[in-house]
Amino acid sequence: MGNCNRTQKPSSSSNNLEKPPQAAEFRRTAEPSLYGRYNCKCCWFADKNLITCSDHYLCLRCHQIMLRNSELCNICWKPLPTSIRVPLEASAPDL
C-alpha cells in the first residue's frame, strides 16, 4: 500500500543517543595548577588516580560507584566516561 519501495530515513533523535562514548584521561598524579592541587569532586579526599569527567576530576572509586547507579555523573549530569585512556608517563627523569 502506498510507497512500499521508499526507504525511511533514520530520525535525528536516534542519532543523538548512539554517540560513541569519549575516552576519559587517567592521571596517576594530577597536573599542578595555579590554585593548588586537584581533588576528586565527589569525595574531596583522593588526589591520585583521577579521571577527567567533563569539567572536573573523579577518583576511580567514586567513578565506579556512579557507574553502578546510573550512566550520568551526579555532579555535572553529563554521561560518565566508560573507557579510560592511560597516557604514557615517564617512570624516571630524563638524564
Swiss-Prot record:
InterPro entries: RING_finger_Z_arenaviridae, Z_RING-type_Znf_sf, Z_RING_Znf. It is found in: Virion; Host cytoplasm, Host perinuclear region; Host cell membrane. GO terms for biological process: viral budding from plasma membrane; viral budding via host ESCRT complex. One of its GO terms (cellular component) is host cell plasma membrane. Residues 1-25 are annotated as: Disordered. It comes from the Viruses. It holds the Pfam family zf-P11. Late-budding domains (L domains) are short sequence motifs essential for viral particle budding. They recruit proteins of the host ESCRT machinery (Endosomal Sorting Complex Required for Transport) or ESCRT-associated proteins. Inhibition of host myristoylation by the compound DDD85646 leads to proteasomal degradation of protein Z (and not lysosomal), strong inhibition of Z-mediated assembly and budding, and reduced levels of viral replication and transcription. This is RING finger protein Z. The gene is Z.
